[in-house]
Every structure is written in structure tokens, then in C-alpha cells.
Amino acid sequence: MNLSFFDQFASPQLLGIPLILLSLLFPTLLLPSPNNRWINNRLSTLQLWFLQLITKQLMMPLNKAGHKWALILTSLMTFLLLINLLGLLPYTFTPTTQLSMNMALAFPLWLATLLTGLRNQPSISLGHLLPEGTPTPLIPALILIETTSLLIRPLALGVRLTANLTAGHLLIQLISTATLALLPTMPTISVLTATVLLLLTILELAVAMIQAYVFVLLLSLYLQENI
């Protein structure tokens, strides 16, 4: 049976049971469990430093009222980061290449930030739909444009994460396939292609980390507008 390049993005199944939930739970096994020791080991210390760094970066734009979101945003950042990095391992499934999953993360959190603004400061939240100093004839058009841009925010969040990871995985598979195909006939070109593959893999490691950070950072900026 001929396999398609997009088969790697299909959700794996065992006896008809989707295994995507298992892949979502696996990153939690990599996190060190807390203990009662006075001195933590190197892994726990590194994890604590990383979480503090993420929390500081995400909470800096927010006021004190937004600090209650620190736990969920930091947890989401760690979750996406681990899933993206684990998806770069050979023969693994990356759940964040599924638009349905990314939308399931983006839409509820975006809606929560929007409802927070409408509850706490409705006039300011609705005021974002009409920029200050807008000429009167342009008011209806600008309200429609701003409303549309507001409603497509969760779609943009989900599509951005899906597209970046999907494109990277496809490039890696295409170049690795070309490397194996050229090895028997043109070994020199195959070595050069393997070098490109190594550089692309390093780039994808950076993309996996950056996209997880951008996803959560944009959510924190949406929250900043509504608190």
C-alpha cells in the first residue's frame, strides 16, 4: 500500500480506539514529581527555573488582576512545548498538528478573555471595536472590520500553530525521503541533503518552542485588553 506524506498526521488507533488521548497524557510523565527534600535535584531545579522564567515573561504585560491566570497560561505553555518537542522524535504522533485540537485549546481561552472583559469593563471592551477619532462616515465599516478581526482571533491562533508544525514535519519527511533515495546512486549529494536535514531539524526545534510561546503570549495579550 502506498503511504501518503500526510499519513503521519492521522490520529493513531488501536483496535479502533483513538490513541490521541494517550499522546496528550504522555508529556506529564516527563515532569519530575514534587518531593519533600530540602534540596532538589538538577532536573527539578531546572524545571522550577524554567517555569519561573515563563511565568515572569507572560505576566509582565498584565496587571494584578490578570495574575490569577498565571497557572493556566504557564501550564498551557509547558504542555504545548512538550508536545511539540516530542512530536519531532521519529515515528511519533504530534497532536498539535491537528487543527481540531488547537481550536479546542484556542477558542475556550479566547472566549474566556472576551467574557472577562465584557463582565469587568464592558464599555472599554466594546470601545475596542471603534478606534478613537474615527470619521463618522467610516464608523459602520470600521465596526464590522474590528468585529471580524476579533472573531477570527481563535481561528488565527489554531491555524498558526497547525500550519507551522505541519509545514516543518512535511519538509523533514520530504528531505529525509530524498536523502534515502539518493544514497545508493549519488552518495555525495545524499550527504549534503542529510546536512540540510540536520539544519532543518535544529530549525524545527526552535519553531516548536517559539510557536508554543507565541500561542500563549497572544492569549496573554488578548487578556491584557480585557482586564
Swiss-Prot record:
Query: Which Pfam family, any one of them, does this sequence belong to?
Result: ATP-synt_A
Give the superkingdom in one word.
Answer: Eukaryota
**Which cysteines in this chain are paired by disulphide bridges?**
none
Membrane topology, as annotated: Multi-pass membrane protein
Q: Which GO terms describe its biological process?
A: proton motive force-driven ATP synthesis; proton transmembrane transport
Its annotated function is as follows: Subunit a, of the mitochondrial membrane ATP synthase complex (F(1)F(0) ATP synthase or Complex V) that produces ATP from ADP in the presence of a proton gradient across the membrane which is generated by electron transport complexes of the respiratory chain. ATP synthase complex consist of a soluble F(1) head domain - the catalytic core - and a membrane F(1) domain - the membrane proton channel. These two domains are linked by a central stalk rotating inside the F(1) region and a stationary peripheral stalk.
Listed under subunit, the entry gives: Component of the ATP synthase complex composed at least of ATP5F1A/subunit alpha, ATP5F1B/subunit beta, ATP5MC1/subunit c (homooctomer), MT-ATP6/subunit a, MT-ATP8/subunit 8, ATP5ME/subunit e, ATP5MF/subunit f, ATP5MG/subunit g, ATP5MK/subunit k, ATP5MJ/subunit j, ATP5F1C/subunit gamma, ATP5F1D/subunit delta, ATP5F1E/subunit epsilon, ATP5PF/subunit F6, ATP5PB/subunit b, ATP5PD/subunit d, ATP5PO/subunit OSCP.
Instruction: Report what the protein is called.
Output: ATP synthase F(0) complex subunit a
Q: Which organism is it from?
A: Struthio camelus (Common ostrich)
What are the top taxonomic ranks of the organism? Answer: Eukaryota, Metazoa, Chordata, Craniata, Vertebrata
